[in-house]
Amino acid sequence: MEHESKTKMDGIEMEKGKKENGSRKGVEITMRVLALVLTMVAATVLGVAKQTEVVPIKLIPTLPPLNVATTAKASYLSAFVYNICANAIACGYTAISIMIVIISKGRRSKCLLMAVLIGDLMMVALLCSSTGAAGAIGLMGRHGNKHVMWKKVCGVFGKFCNQAAVSVAITLIASVVFMLLVVLDALKLP
C-alpha cells in the first residue's frame, strides 16, 4: 500500500506538519509540567525550612554566656518570603498556562500566543529577581559581612541554610525552564 499524503500549495506535507506541531506541543506541556513541579518544590522547601538551636550569647565579658534557644525560619527574612511568593505565583500561572495549552489543541490565535509569551517572560523576570534577592541573603548568612559586623549564621543553622540554598537553586532552574518556554513561544509566532 502506498502512503497517501495531502500537500499544500507550497509542497509541504500536511501530515508532517501535524506531527511536528504535536511533538512541539508535547515538549511544551512537558516543560510546563517541569516548571510547575520545580516552582512548587522550591516554594515548599523554603516554606517549611525551620531550625531551632541553642546559641550562647555573651552580654558582659566578665559573665558566662547565656544560652538562648533561637529559631531560623524563612518568614523572618523578607527576601525568603518574596522567593516563596514568587514561586507560588509562578506555580499558579503554570497550572493555568498548562490548561490553556491543552484546551487550545494547537488552534491558538496570535493574541493568545502573545499573552502566553508575555506571561512566561514575566515569570522569568519574577523568578530571576526572587533568586537574586534570596541568594544575596543566603550568601550573607553563609559568609557574613565583616564591614557591618554581621556574623555567619550558617555554622549554627546549617540545615536551614542548606534548605534555603536548595530552594534558590531550584528556583534558578525553574527560571531557565521559563526562559526556554519564552524561546519556544517566540518560535511559534507567525
Swiss-Prot record:
One of its GO terms (cellular component) is plasma membrane. Residues 50-83, 133-163 are extracellular. Residues 1-21 are annotated as: Disordered. Keywords: Cell membrane, Membrane, Transmembrane, Transmembrane helix. Residues 1-28, 105-111, 185-190 are cytoplasmic. It comes from the Eukaryota. Homodimer and heterodimers. Belongs to the Casparian strip membrane proteins (CASP) family. This is CASP-like protein 1E1. The lineage of its organism: Eukaryota, Viridiplantae, Streptophyta, Embryophyta, Tracheophyta.
